[in-house]
A protein has these predicted regions:
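Short, acidic loop-to-helix structural element flanking the phosphoryl-transfer center
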Residues: 14-34, 94-99, 151-153, 177-190
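Asp-based phosphoryl-transfer active-site loop
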Residues: 1-16, 183, 212
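Mg2+-dependent phosphoryl-transfer enzymes with acidic/Ser/Thr/Gly-rich catalytic loops
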Residues: 19, 169-261
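Short hydrophobic/aromatic-enriched beta-strand-loop microsegments
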Residues: 57-63, 132-134, 218-223
């Protein structure tokens, strides 16, 4: 049984947040009931919207490995916290802990401006998201996205939280948050209920390194600059295309055409 763990932005989604080039491959994966698990910096509400659009209803990993959301009854036992329709395993910290520290630093004169300091309209302007999508992006539970900062303030934040420099913005999340750890937890659950599990992981940047190192077959899609990110990951396959085009090409090679023995 294959399990696919995938990043979203610039991997399964293109620069315009579309998955059109992977649509047919997604349809084929759903037909053969292969789990597709999102593992992204995106929030629960953002991922729920994408899952609904794609018709994917498997577990998902939010906010850079801060938490795992598992639909209730999906596994026999998870020991997760029951929250609404999910069993939730929290690895990171609550947003309020991060915001409290950011506000303390702001009061001391450090420049740190994040999503919680901005309106959805302002977030939409700097990200290219729609107003509705910006509202979903702002509705964070375990992390904060920093738009503007000074280096001294960032160094202060690093003492208490993980600080990840992304392609455009800074992501701040709890010390326990870890994409790789989240993937290993979910893989263990699958192995308890299924035989011969093979894990596939797809990403596009160095922030996906923990994801790629936690799977049997790591796949790096090409960046939209025409280059691959430089990653030291064993047996890393470099997909020829960028974004969902590269995603679809790799899945055809390794999953739908039986490339993995």
């Amino acid at each position: 049984m294959y399990i696919i763990f995938t990043d979203l932005d610039n991997t399964l989604l293109d620069k315009e947040y579309s998955y059109r080039e992977a649509k047919e491959v997604l349809r084929e994966l759903k037909e053969v009931k292969i789990p597709i698990i999102f593992c992204s910096a995106k929030t629960r509400r953002e991922q729920e919207k994408i899952r609904e659009e794609m018709g994917i209803y498997h577990p998902f990993i939010v906010e850079d490995g801060s938490a795992i959301y598992i639909p209730r009854g999906y596994f026999k036992e998870t020991k997760g916290q029951p929250i609404n329709d999910y069993e939730v395993i929290i690895l990171g910290t609550k947003l309020e802990n991060i915001i409290k520290e950011i506000q303390n630093l702001q009061k001391k004169g450090y420049k740190i401006i994040g999503y919680q300091d901005m309106t959805p309209e302002e977030i939409a302007q700097v990200t290219g998201l729609s107003i509705h999508e910006a509202k979903l992006a702002k509705d964070r539970e375990f992390s904060e996205t920093i738009i503007e900062y000074d280096n001294r303030g960032l160094e202060k934040l690093k003492r208490k939280f993980n600080v990840e420099i992304g392609g455009r913005f800074i992501h701040v999340f709890g010390k326990g948050a870890d994409k790789g750890k989240a993937i290993k937890i979910l893989t263990r659950f699958y192995k308890e209920e299924h035989e011969k599990i093979k894990t596939i992981g797809l990403g596009d940047s160095y922030t996906d390194k923990p994801l790629l190192k936690a799977v049997d077959t790591p796949i790096l899609v090409k960046g939209y600059n025409g280059k691959w990110a430089e990653l030291d990951v064993k047996n890393l396959y470099h997909a020829k295309g960028a974004g969902p085009k590269g995603w679809a090409e790799a899945i055809k090679k390794f999953v739908l055409k039986g490339g993995i023995k």
